[in-house]
C-alpha cells in the first residue's frame, strides 16, 4: 500500500506529509512491488530468485527500475550481480521477514533476495535489516526491541540523512519506531 500511495511523490522532496493524498489519481505500483512479488513467488514456489526477478520485471518493463537494474535486466541470461548498495535490496526483502520461521532463516532469505543484484555488503545489510524488522514485528517484539536489534545493531550511528540503501532503511524503521499509530 505504501509503495502504491508513494508513487506520485517519488523523487520529490515532499515536506507536507499531512497533505499526502492516499487516493491520488496517479497511484500505481512501482518497480519495488514487482520485485517484492517476484521474491515472494520464488520462495513460495521454490524457484530461483534471480530468474523470477528477471522474468517478472521484463514482463512489466514500464516501472521505474534503476539504471543498474535495467542494465542487469537487458543482458542475456542471468547476469552477475553488479555490487549495488542502493535501496532496491531493502525494498524487495519483505517476504523474507514474513516467511521465515527463525531469525537465522530470515537472514538467509533476505540475503538471497539481495544477491542477484545487490551483492555489496551494504546492499545485503539493508535487505537483512529490513527483513529482520518485519520478522521481529511479526513475532510480537516491541519497537524498542526492533530499535536495539536492528537500527542500533546494523546502523549504530543511524540518522535520517545517510547515503545509500541504508538511508531508506534507517528512515522507514525510524518512522515506524516513532509513530503512535502502529
Predicted segments with their positions:
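Structured, active/binding-site neighborhoods that engage oxygen-rich ligands
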Residues: 1-182
